Each structure stands twice: as C-alpha cells, then as structure tokens.
Amino acid sequence: MSNLKEKLLNHQNLIRNIRSFFYSRNVVEVVTPSLLTTPTTDVYIDSIEVSVNQALSKSSKFYLHTSPELEMKRLLAKGSGDIFQICQVFRDNEHGHINSNEFTMLEFYRVGFDMHQLIDDIKALLISLGNDDPVKEISYAQAFYDYAEIDILNSDFEGLKNILESHGLNSDYEWIEDIQMVLFVHLIEPKIKTIPVCFIYDFPKQQAALAQIDGLVANRFEMYIKGLSLIHI
C-alpha cells in the first residue's frame, strides 16, 4: 500500500469513528453555511474575505467561517438538541508549520452538560479512537501555581507586566488577557509538552469569550496533546 493511500484510509477511519461515537450517543450531525455575511468577532482570529457575483446576493462581500459555532448555536436556540459537525474552516494569518489557513474542525454541543461532563465526553471520544495515554486535568490557576509559582487570577495588570519583564519578555501590552496568554505560552506550555493529554480548565474571566463567568474564572477549557492545543471549549 502506498504511503498516500495509507494516509487517506487513516483519515477516513478517523472521521468514520468520530461520527460513530456521536451517533451512538444520539448526537445529530448537521451542516451549516461556510459563507457568512459577517466576520468573526474573536479579536484573536482573522476571517478570510471573499467576493461573489452581486447577482447572487444583495452584498458582494462575504467571509468564510472560522468555525461553525455561530450557525450551530442558532440551531441550538431553535431547539435542535445535541449536535455535531465536521467541516473545513478558514482563517487568515494562520499559515505556518503548525497552523494552516484551512483545516478540519470538529464542533459539538451537548445540551445541559457542564464543563466537566464535556471533558468526560472528550475523554471517552479519545478512548474510542484508541488513545490509552494518561490524561491530566488541572485548572489554569493551579498550572501557574505548580509550574511558575504565579497567582495568575489575583495578579493585577502591573504585576503581570513586571513578571513579563523579569523573564525578559516584551511587556508592551494594553490588555491583561494578552499578558496572561503570553505568560501561558512561555511558562506553562513548555511544561505540559511532556504530558500526553492535558485538560486546562477554569480560564481567567478576561478570556471568557462566550463562556459563562463564575467569579474570577470562565467555565471553559482547552485540551493539549503534548503541549499543542487542539480543543477549545
């Protein structure tokens, strides 16, 4: 078997097994538009703008979706129940040895699930895909305590700028969430590269995005595989 054929079959099996996992839990597969009239509102992600024949629409300016989140949440609001989607997404300024302007994304929603139930769901998905590596779960704050001895949630803007400077890092930032993320990349991510699968949960409220805020933290998490962030919820 050629190397290309093997890769294609592996990809086919991966997608099929993901679908089987969600089908077995009565999660409905959906397809939503990838061509939208507005760009993403996420300040850290850039949409790709495209133009179409004006005869097809009132506007000639559209944007390729950076994720199916918005359209899927509209389905949820209409009472769809549990849903998932596997699709291509597009982001500008993402090309590199890790990121790409186009990639495949899995997006899913489980109605009534809290953050830790979603983590358990993903762990079950990984097991169904053949993963038997140990899994670590740790809060954002605890990770900073354990790996950098920093009280990240109770440190103010100036305090975190001083920490950046003490590590020889650029401190020219206007928002505390930017400093938090830079510190995470430089001080925490290198430490979790040795962990096969790591869930970081309870991010600072400044990084809530669309997540619910509970005190100083947002009820969201990310999953890292050997230091590479692959899941954001």
Question: Which residues does each PLM region occupy?
Answer:
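Aromatic- and glycine-enriched glycan-recognition loops and surfaces
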Residues: N10-L14
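Short, contiguous pre-domain boundary segments
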Residues: M1-L4
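A conserved active-site cap/scaffold subdomain adjacent to cofactor or substrate pockets
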Residues: S100-M105, Y109-S166
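A translation/RNA-centric and nucleic-acid-associated enzymatic feature enriched
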Residues: N17, P33-Y63, S67-L75, F84-V111, ...
